[in-house]
Regions:
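Hydrophobic alpha-helical scaffolding
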Residues: 32-39, 67-73, 85, 212, ...
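A short acidic (Asp/Glu
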Residues: 170, 245-250, 271-275
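Short amphipathic alpha-helical "interface-anchor" segments enriched in bulky aromatics
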Residues: 49, 95, 349-381
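Dynamic "connector" segments at or just before major functional cores
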Residues: 1-210, 214-229, 254
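Short, surface-exposed basic-aromatic patches at helix termini and helix-loop junctions that form
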Residues: 249-258
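Acidic/histidine-rich, metal-coordinating catalytic segments
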Residues: 162, 233-243
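Hydrophobic "anchor" residues on beta-strands that sit immediately upstream
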Residues: 158, 236, 259
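An anionic, glycine-rich sequence signature occurring as long contiguous blocks
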Residues: 2-4, 9-26, 259-367
Length: 383
């Protein structure tokens, strides 16, 4: 006997796509026998509120058009662009295909019977109309949204910063060849919350690693804004050696609320300082190999040692605390350095905290899953 599933009530069908807010005062009833079908019904779930981040971004773009002739507001167009990306239409050139889709219309606040959404030409004009001041306001909006996501000020915030490649395949502005990735690309800077995994700020940058001075200016603005919102919160920067800039360390030295935990590139002076501990670790590794039995594998033998030292580079104003990790295995000797403002915890604890920044690579992958690295626009200022 087969169970009859064709007589599902309308109330059961409505519960699958219930919305907290109707579209232009009209309730949405989901049925599967209407002539106007859409495969993008999930957009109605994504439209949980009118005051979304894309809506706020659209309101930040100055509109110099003759308003009596405007048929598509910038707020609606930005929402349309974002929702199209969710549906798999990543380029502005794709606007002509889904512009008449009923679900896409309702996701931006229109009725299915209303006129179609904007075309490719209109969307392209919007993207080319964005200037640097607007991009700055949008970047500030991201940080403001991050602050508003907390019900109360946190005691401690970790800023995980890193850049990644966004490959380009045309004549885009500021696209450069990156030898590490062996590709022509942009190098966006991404800042995440290391605890809550929230995206704080994305920023598109040229296709090479940014100079430390430019990165320091960006980080300082973010930290200063967070401190204005949360005066009693400790803000800690965590990143690789690229973010170990003397400008940021010198600025943060007298700020009690700013800490940093970044990688440090090794040099001959640092290697000379840890030479004796390195030799002791290598001797311990040899002794461990001698104790192995015939069935044991030497690949399982790893010797790790952690040390702290005070070090001052020639360009630094102040002496910094440096953590050295010496790892000896069958693959050889690996020495890593980390510079920090934290002088309370043990060297091993500090280095373990630094290693947690590796989780950020997974968060960057999640961002790329939503086509954030799609670089189809010729102008670098185009969203």
């Amino acid at each position: 006997m087969c169970k009859n599933t064709t007589n599902n009530s309308v109330e059961q069908q409505k519960s699958l796509f219930s919305l907290p807010e109707p579209v232009l005062g009209k309730k949405i009833k989901v049925v599967f026998n209407a002539p106007d079908m859409s495969s993008n019904g999930g957009l109605l779930l994504a439209r949980s509120s009118k005051d979304t981040l894309p809506s706020k971004m659209g309101r930040l773009i100055p509109d110099d058009r003759t308003q009596c002739l405007v048929r598509h507001s910038y707020e609606e167009m930005v929402c349309q662009r974002v929702n199209q990306i969710l549906c798999g239409y990543e380029d502005a050139n794709d606007c002509d295909r889904p512009r008449c889709d009923s679900a896409l219309k309702m996701s931006v606040g229109r009725r299915p019977s209303d006129e179609d959404l904007c075309s490719q030409a209109t969307m392209t004009r919007l993207e080319n109309n964005v200037d640097s001041k607007t991009l700055y306001r949008i970047g500030k909006l991201f940080v403001e949204q991050y602050v508003k996501s907390f019900s109360k000020p946190p005691r401690h915030v970790i800023l995980d910063a890193d850049d990644t490649n966004a490959n380009t395949y045309g004549a885009q502005q500021l696209t450069l060849f990156n030898a590490y990735y062996n590709e022509y690309c942009h190098m966006p800077l991404l800042i995440f919350d290391g605890v809550s995994k929230k995206l704080i700020l994305p920023m598109l940058r040229p296709g090479r690693r940014n100079k430390s001075l430019n990165v320091s200016r960006i980080l300082r603005r973010v930290v200063e804004y967070l401190h204005e919102c949360w005066p009693n919160t400790v803000i800690e920067l965590r990143g690789d050696s690229h973010f170990c800039s003397r400008e940021f360390m010198d600025w943060a030295w007298s700020k009690w609320y700013v800490r940093y935990l970044t990688g440090l590139s090794g040099n001959t002076k640092l290697l000379d300082i840890v030479d004796k501990p390195r030799r002791r670790a290598e001797n311990d590794f040899k002794k461990a190999l001698e104790k192995l039995h015939g069935s044991d594998s030497k690949d399982n033998v790893v010797i790790r040692r952690y040390f702290k030292l005070d070090y001052k580079a020639q360009s630094w104003k102040h002496e910094q605390r440096v953590i050295a990790k010496i790892e000896v295995s069958a693959k050889g000797t690996n020495i890593r350095f980390v510079v920090t403002k934290n002088r309370n915890n043990s060297p091993k604890t500090i280095y373990k905290r630094y290693c947690k920044r590796g989780e950020m690579e997974l968060w960057i992958k999640d961002v790329k899953y939503f086509k954030a690295d799609r670089m189809s626009c010729a102008k670098v200022r185009s969203p």
